Amino acid sequence: MQLKIKEIFNQDYVKLEGQKIQIKAWVRSNRDSKKIGFLVLNDGSSLTNLQAVYRVDKIDNYEEIAAARMWAAVVIEGVIKLTPTAKQPLELEVLNAQILKQSDEDFLLSNNDLNLETLRLNAHLRPRTNLFHAIMKVRATLAFAVHEFMNQNEYSWLAAPLFTGNDAEGAGETFSIQKFDNEEFFGKQTHLSVTGQLQAEAYAQAFGNVYTFGPTFRAEKSHTNRHLAEFWMIEPEMAFVDLKGMQDIVEDLVKHVIKAVLEKNQQELEFLAQRNDENLIKKLQKVVESKFERIEYKDAVKILADAVKNGHQFENNEIFFGMDLGSEHERYMCETYHQGPVFLQNYPKDIKAFYMKLNDDQQTVASTDLLIPGVGELVGGSQREDSYEKLLKRCQELKMPIESLQWYLDLRRFGYYMSSGFGIGFERLVMYVTGVNNIKDTIPFPRSHGQIEF
Amino acid sequence: MQLKIKEIFNQDYVKLEGQKIQIKAWVRSNRDSKKIGFLVLNDGSSLTNLQAVYRVDKIDNYEEIAAARMWAAVVIEGVIKLTPTAKQPLELEVLNAQILKQSDEDFLLSNNDLNLETLRLNAHLRPRTNLFHAIMKVRATLAFAVHEFMNQNEYSWLAAPLFTGNDAEGAGETFSIQKFDNEEFFGKQTHLSVTGQLQAEAYAQAFGNVYTFGPTFRAEKSHTNRHLAEFWMIEPEMAFVDLKGMQDIVEDLVKHVIKAVLEKNQQELEFLAQRNDENLIKKLQKVVESKFERIEYKDAVKILADAVKNGHQFENNEIFFGMDLGSEHERYMCETYHQGPVFLQNYPKDIKAFYMKLNDDQQTVASTDLLIPGVGELVGGSQREDSYEKLLKRCQELKMPIESLQWYLDLRRFGYYMSSGFGIGFERLVMYVTGVNNIKDTIPFPRSHGQIEF
C-alpha cells in the first residue's frame, strides 16, 4: 500500500499498526550509529515528517542508506509501529530502502536559521523549508476557498484581459509593451492591466455576479515590504447590489476563507504562530466571530483628530476632511479605536477613482475600504456610478481619454441600474493570514523593482 | 421572497404555485396589446427566461411598463402561476412593476442573427446574447472543475511569475517590457512568460503535486481561429510520477471537467449543440466513457504513411519519422484512425523542448500529446529530464543561456528523482467543450495581433 504522509496522519492511525506500507519521499535528516539509523522523511503532502528506523540486521544496504543526504529521494517499505511514548505517535520500521536519487552535499538551505533575505535569493529552494511550506500551503487553501465561495454563491469566474490599450484605469504607473518587429503588436500602445474591474462590470450587467482572480501589474519603484510589481487580485462585481450589500459580501468572503484555513491548516498555523505572531490563531478566530464595524470617513476624521487632541502622535498629525488616510491612521482605526476589522465608507470624491458613485452630498462617493489589524487596507470597493451623464462629466473633469472608455460609458445606456464591486489584493490577504511581514514572502517568485530572478 | 430565475427553475417549482416573489432582472423582450403585456426577463443566473404577464386592470403604471425597452432593468413583484400547457412551465402574474433604469433605443445586439464578427466588435455586450451566455457559463464551470479536481487530489495552486528575465523557456515569440524611466525596471530585459512549468518543477520537488492556472502570452502574428496573444494555461506538475502515470492524470482531469459540464450545464449544452454541433453532447459523453488510446509516435508515422499509401490525401503527404505532425495528421489519428481521444507518445527529441527526458533509444523523449477530435492537440506533457548532465548537455547543444537557467539545472542536484507535467490550453478546452470554432469566442475579451479593444 503506497501512502502519502498526510494520508497516514489524517486517519485513525492506530489502525495502521503493523501495516506494511510504501512511501516515496525526500530525506530531511539522517543520523545513524553503526547498528541503527533514523531517516526523517517528507513527501510534501504535509508539514509533518515521518521517521523511518533502519537497522543493520534488517536491511542489506545499511551503509548505502546511512549515506543518504538531506533531500535525497528515497523509496521505503516498512511496517507502521505506534510509539505512544515518543513525540511522534508512530514510526516506520524499515524492511527495504532504496535511494532513488542522491542529493549533492552543498544543499544551500540545510541551516534552519537562514534569514528571509537569503531564502528570497533561493526562491527555487525555499518551499523546502518548513516556513515556506506553511506559507504556501495556507496560500493554496486561501485561493481554493475563494473559488469555492464564489462557486457556492453562483459567481462566474471571469478572465479579465491583461493587455490593455487603455492607460486610464485609475491606479498608478503601468508597464508598457515594447514594439514587436518595429510596430505596435496590437496596433496601438499597449499596457499591462492594473485592474479587471471595468470588464467585470460589463459581465456583471449580463450575468449578475462575476469575479476575476488574476494577476495585475504595477510599475511602482517602492522597495517597501508591502509592494510587488506583479501580484494577484480578486475582483468580484455584482449587479443590483449597493454599497451596504457589497460590504456584507466582503465580510462573508473574508470570513469564509479564514475559516477554511483554520479548518484545513491547523498545523501550518501553529507553526506560523510560533514563528511570526503568537496571537495569530486567536486573531483569525476573532475575525471569523466578529461583526465588522462600519464607520463613515467623516467620522473617522473626527476620531483621528480627537486622538491627536488627546495626545496620540501620528507621523502625520494634520487631520482634515479630504485627506487621504495614511497607513498609520488606518491602523489606528482598526487596532486602537476599534480592535478588529473596520469598513470606512463614503470617502471624499477627490481621493477616489473616477468610476465611483457620487453621493447626494456631491462631496463623497459610495466607496469603502476594509481595514484589518496588522495590515491596514485589505479590500477596497465601491458602488459604481450608474449615470451616463455624471460619469461622463467626471471623466471630463479628470481629462480622461473618453474615446477608449466609450464602451465603458455605454454600459450605462443599457439598463445599468446598479453595480458594486471590490478588489482584494491576494498577497495582502496571505500576509494577514500567515502573519508574514514582507509581501515578497507570500508569493512563490516575487517580482519587484530590480528583482526578476528565476 | 426575492429569488433568482435559476432558483425558481432549479427547485420543484410546483410548490411555488401561488407564491408571491420579487425579481430584479433585465428585459429581454416586451410586447403588449392595450390590456395585457408580456415581459420576458433574464437576470443572468440562467439561460432560462421568466415570462411576466402584466395587465392594465392589475397595475397602475401599465403604460410605463409597456414602454420598458430591451435591457431595461426592472423590479417585479408577482405571483407564480403554473402553465402546464404552455412551453414554459410557469409564469409570473405581475402585482407591481417598476422600471429601475430604462435602456436606450439603440441597443446594438437586439438582432439575434448577428454574426460572430459583429459580436466580437461588441465584446462588452456579447455576454448578453444566449450564445455567449452559454459559452461563458460553460467556461466558468470548466475553470471551477479544474480547481476542484486539483483540490480533491491534493495539488497546491501555484502562481507562476508572469515577468521573466529568461528568454529560453522554449515556446515561440515573447512580448518584452518597455524601459521605464529610461531604465530596465527589473535591471535586465524582461519578457512575459510563456509557461510556468520551470517554476512549477521547483515547487513539485517540495510539495509533490502542484498546478498553475494563469495567463500566458505569445507574440504570434497568426490570424487563425486557433491563436490568441493572451490565453490561460493549466500546468500541473507531479514529483515521483512518470509519463504513463501522468497520462492517467490527464485522462482523469479531462473526464472530470467534462463530467462537471454535463452535470451543471445541460441547458447551455443543448443550446450550443443546436447552434454549433448537433453531436456535441454525445461527443462529450463518449469522451467521459472511453478509455483514451495510447499510440507511439513511431507507430503513428506508420499509420499515417499507410493512409497515404491507401489513397488518403493530406495537404502534406510526406510522412517520415522525425516530422512534426500537422493538425491534419493529428486529427486523422483521433478522428479517422481512432474515433476518440488519443495520446501520442515518445516523440523525436529534435521536435520537442529541451527539458524532456531522453529515452534509452537516445532518439526520442518521454513526451506525449493528447489529441482530441475536432481540436487536435489539447494537452502536451512530458516526463522531465532528471539528469543534471544530460540536461546541461542538451542546453549546450541548443546554445541556450545556461546562466539564467542555472537554478533550474540545480534542481537536479538535490534529489530530483522524477517529475512529470503537462499543459492544457484552457481556451482550447473551452472550444472543444462548447463546439465553438474560433478561439476568440471562448475568452471574454480576446487579444490577438492588432486587436486590443475594451
Swiss-Prot record, chains A, B:
Keywords from the named record: Aminoacyl-tRNA synthetase, ATP-binding, Cytoplasm, Ligase, Nucleotide-binding, Protein biosynthesis
Keyword set includes Transmembrane helix: no
Biological process, per Gene Ontology: asparaginyl-tRNA aminoacylation
Places the protein is found: Cytoplasm
Reactions this protein catalyses: tRNA(Asn) + L-asparagine + ATP = L-asparaginyl-tRNA(Asn) + AMP + diphosphate + H(+)
GO molecular function, one term: asparagine-tRNA ligase activity
Main location: cytoplasm
One matching Pfam family: tRNA-synt_2
Domain of life: Bacteria
This protein's GO CC annotations: cytoplasm
EC numbers: 6.1.1.22
Subunit structure, interactors included: Homodimer.
Protein family (similarity comment): Belongs to the class-II aminoacyl-tRNA synthetase family.
Full protein name: Asparagine--tRNA ligase
Taxon lineage: Bacteria, Bacillati, Mycoplasmatota, Mycoplasmoidales, Mycoplasmoidaceae
